[in-house]
Amino acid sequence: MSNSIFIDTWGWLTLNDAGERRHNEVASLYRTLITDRTIIYTSTFVLDETFTLFFKRLNSFQAKQAMLQLSEAFTTEQFQLIQIDEFRFSQTKLLRLKYLDKPQISFTDLTSILIMKEFNIQRILTEDAHFTQIGLGFKLEPSSF
């Protein structure tokens, strides 16, 4: 899907933490995604990581606001929250076995890869190079990575 992007934990955290080195760049890209009506995907596993990091890295008020705003966004058609159900979890275990030579790729990242393949998503907002190391043609955003 050409007008779609998957947002990884790094993307959500960087967007919501003004102290992050690439916050302004990610915030600008995010505004463009919204304006262009890009379909934004993420998973329940990614949001689990994201919400945990919000409360570790931001003050409690900021973390609460970020969590509520992000949760609210996923009630709109432009945002798609993909559940990691039993089938996807099983498929991810197979991916883990396929990429034994890449132990640094987290299980959560593998669930994201599975979703990106399932929904034909080529772009991902992340700073994590693992997504390009598996040879599936994923493109990291912002594109200056």
Predicted ranges, named:
Residues S2, I113-F145:
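Acidic, PIN/NYN-like endoribonuclease modules and their adjacent C-terminal/linker elements
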Residues I39, Q78-Q80, G137-K139:
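Conserved beta-strand segments of alpha/beta enzyme cores
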Residues M1-T42, F55-Q69:
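Short, well-structured N-terminal submotif of metal-dependent ribonuclease cores
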Residues T9, T44, S106-L110:
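Conserved glycosyltransferase catalytic-site signature
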Residues Y41-S43, T126-E127:
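Short beta-strand segments at enzyme active-site cores
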Residues W12, L47, F131-T132:
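A generic structural signal for short hydrophobic patches within well-formed alpha-helices
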